[in-house]
Regions:
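Rossmann-fold cofactor-recognition segment
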Residues: 45-57
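NAD(P)-cofactor binding segment of oxidoreductase domains
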Residues: 67, 86-113
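N-terminal Rossmann NAD(P)H-binding glycine-rich loop of SDR-like oxidoreductase domains
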Residues: 4-24
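Conserved Rossmann-fold NAD(P)-dependent oxidoreductase catalytic core, especially the SDR/UDP-sugar
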Residues: 75, 100-142
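Conserved catalytic Lys-bearing alpha helix of Rossmann-like short-chain dehydrogenase/reductases
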Residues: 96-102, 146-154
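NAD(P)H-binding glycine-rich loop region in Rossmannoid oxidoreductase-like domains
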Residues: 55-94
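C-terminal substrate-binding subdomain of Rossmann-fold SDR/epimerase-dehydratase oxidoreductases
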Residues: 199, 204-206, 211-264
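NAD(P)-dependent short-chain dehydrogenase/reductase
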Residues: 155-210, 216-220, 225
Length: 264
């Protein structure tokens, strides 16, 4: 990678990934792609190029790729799980239609594409322990359906057109840099904000509901290393399972009470 376009650079992952890439590739163009009304601010805006790139607008993607001689696209545009359920049509338009636009530009311009998948792509029939790489998925949310579709569409573009597509299936991501953005696992970040503000936290999950999580720096490393890997050694491209830790709301709340005894 040398010149990279990050679509969705102001989102939860994109904010930190853009800066990490600029540190990793100081001599390249790491372009922060944003949508109107969500322009980059602070160090993201000050430390490198930016371009308005709405993933539903294929021409904007192509223009940014041409202008900055982009060789790799990180497609991070998506509605997160809880938000997607409230807006299923928009979730499909961004998650699948936007990916199609990105893959078409990549096919025409010779770019590699990273599009994250998720544990949300799994369903009730998926083995919970030591989940196999290749297994039944069958998600029952629009978010998960768009992720499975994205995995298959990316694989198709690799087989059919030779586009270099790669991905990992992220668990819930924990970050203090960007605020939560509507994901089911975002309670694990929201709960700390409530504790600091002295508020009572209303958790959307029942005690005993364990979910896989990952600290953002580990997720960024996975996203970069998969794109740097020798393609000849990749058994799977879309998508590798990655995990880090698992906990339920009680574990977090009990730990918070060690520092904030009155937290509820």
């Amino acid at each position: 990678m040398k010149n990279v376009l990050v679509i969705g650079a102001t989102g939860q992952i994109g904010t930190e990934l853009t800066m990490r890439l600029r540190q990793e590739y100081p001599n390249g163009n790491i372009v922060a792609g944003y949508i109107k009304g969500a322009e980059p601010k602070g160090i993201v805006a000050e430390s490198g190029p930016m371009a308005e790139v709405d993933i539903t607008n294929a021409q904007q993607i192509a223009d940014a790729v041409e202008k900055y001689h982009v060789d790799t696209i990180y497609n991070l545009a998506a509605l997160l799980s809880a938000t997607a359920e409230a807006k299923p049509q928009l979730a499909w338009k961004i998650g699948v239609g936007g990916l199609y636009n990105t893959l078409e530009v990549a096919r025409e311009k010779g770019c590699a594409v990273f599009t994250p998948s998720s544990i949300g792509s799994f369903g009730k029939g998926t083995p919970r322990d030591h989940t196999p790489q290749d297994t039944i998925q069958r998600p029952d949310t629009i978010y998960g359906i768009t992720k499975v579709t994205g995995e298959m569409l990316s694989d198709y573009y690799t087989r059919r057109f030779g586009v270099d597509t790669r991905s990992v299936r992220f668990p819930g991501l924990i970050s203090y840099v960007a605020p939560p953005g509507g994901g089911t696992t975002d309670y694990a970040v929201d709960i700390y904000y409530s504790a600091v503000r002295g508020e009572t936290f209303k958790c959307p999950l029942k005690p005993g509901t364990f979910m896989d999580m990952m600290y953002m720096p580990d997720a960024l490393r996975a996203a970069i290393e998969i794109m740097e890997a020798n393609p000849d050694r990749l058994v799977h491209r879309n998508s590798f399972n990655v995990t880090s830790m698992s906990f339920d709301p009680e574990i977090i709340s009990n730990k918070i009470r060690e520092y904030v005894p009155d937290f509820k």
